[in-house]
């Protein structure tokens, strides 16, 4: 049965079986969802109800696969799903909204409804979720003094406008209006944030009521510690907690009872796995531990949401980071019951067996794991260095400034900015280039007159010895590795946020190039013909040649084999010999690769971005060192394989903090 055709057929057969009567969006009469405080339970249409839900983030799963993943969740015995709504995903620029295609949250929720799944909606405005800036749009930082997640007037004005766009779209999808949404979360784990601003929570409460109506069931979620609920809970909003499988369940729910003496027990985030960071081992939580703890939670009569049921992928630049600065990788597999690629795991079946002891689990076939195909190796050719492609990457030319400007100041919210100045002194002997205030956010790839010098890295490498003559061009290609998504430092400015020094001199007179890699890749695929043999390539290996090459673009293409049915299929791309960079396939930004740091080695390639009618184009931006160069016989290749590798032993030259405890145990996602 492990074929796409079979999966599609099963989906068509299952949908009518899974749909209950009277599930149309217009059948809203007599539909209610309330709390029965006298019996500590929910009531759905007047009947006792308990939800067992799972988290799925539509923004981390291709729309092409939404139905497949939702069906698998339904067949696991879940009666609801939970999802966040990331503000920055839908309003990337002020007043520019995206609600179509991959951003069509309304379609996603209606699809869940069609499949008989209820919805627990978490619209923020802050979501955390290991997502860039916790879902808050970076353009909020244009007001540098803004206090995020507070009653700061500038912040409230932006939030008010956003909620005025989003929530009216959600209102028709509320359960009482015939839709699937049974509860709506206000903010997210606010008790873990430093501001403790009740005026802010009251403002949100009013706006949610204004837009959604007085009968919608609002709730909050906080870690199962008294200190978190002190600032996270608010009268009139039902307080829930979150905790993982290592927690004392009785003690955790006693914390909820201090805020909610009566009402249903709810764990809004029961952790099935945990998040990863570059340079740390892949997180795993043993299946038997999760299954045993879930059994105990359900035996308490509690409602529970499994976070995550499927993690998915941080495509493009969407990953978040923690403090001390530690960005998350492209994969958000989370060791969840469904893998990053949506495959069934032993954990899936173990949790399904637990659920069937308490609730009825649908009978019938479970949609199978999707087949994978190893397309093999693809040769890539070097196109141009970033320096030589500046006319394409930054057609408007540079911004001039006496001192460095941040990404926000040049309105570059993601990706890369090139900072350029000249050496004010002779550096024939190695001279320290320093960021004394740890002002490189987050990595800077340094070159002098086209000769690679090394990398400055936030919190780890703040000084680098460079050489060059007075008047030589100093370039720093600065990469935004993902904004902090949790804690008091989410106002995470990127770029050079403070001055650099060369020896004892402050560097001035900068030319700043915001790089539009997305437009360049989409508009100029195949347009940068020929290999470059200018001064930059001739010198690229004259200094530190064993460690670095200049950041450069490489491209190649491959065709889907003919004569094999049901192609294209999902695959995984790996980068043997490559170091760190970004990859696009047919203009789709897959995300970051960093096998030199680990633990993720392969990137998930969903089949819907591949084509059979023409060659598929791969574009790679290698930032540190490619496995080939202009002066050697090595061939640059990437390889498509049929198995993921996201748990390699990490390698790092820096001591990395263990962030698995963030606050205490499992308090946070």
UniProtKB/Swiss-Prot annotation:
| Species this chain originates from | Felis catus
Q: What's the domain of life for this entry?
A: Eukaryota
Q: What is this protein called?
A: Beta-galactosidase
Which keywords does this Swiss-Prot/TrEMBL entry list? Disulfide bond, Glycoprotein, Glycosidase, Hydrolase, Lysosome, Signal, Zymogen
The active site lies at 189 (proton donor), 269 (nucleophile)
The protein's matches in InterPro entries, at most eight in alphabetical order, are given as: B-gal_1-like, BetaGal1-like_ABD1, BetaGal_gal-bd, Galactose-bd-like_sf, Gly_Hdrlase_35_cat, Glyco_hydro_35_CS, Glycoside_Hdrlase_35, Glycoside_hydrolase_SF
* Positions bound to substrate: 84, 130, 188, 334
Compartments (UniProt record):
Lysosome
Q: GO MF annotations for this entry?
A: beta-galactosidase activity
- Bias (Basic and acidic residues) occurs at 659-669
Pfam families per the UniProt record, alphabetical:
BetaGal_ABD_1, BetaGal_gal-bd, Glyco_hydro_35
Question: Which residues are connected by disulfide bridges in this protein?
Answer: 196-231, 628-636
Looking at the UniProt record for this protein, which Gene Ontology cellular component terms does it annotate, in alphabetical order?
lysosome; vacuole
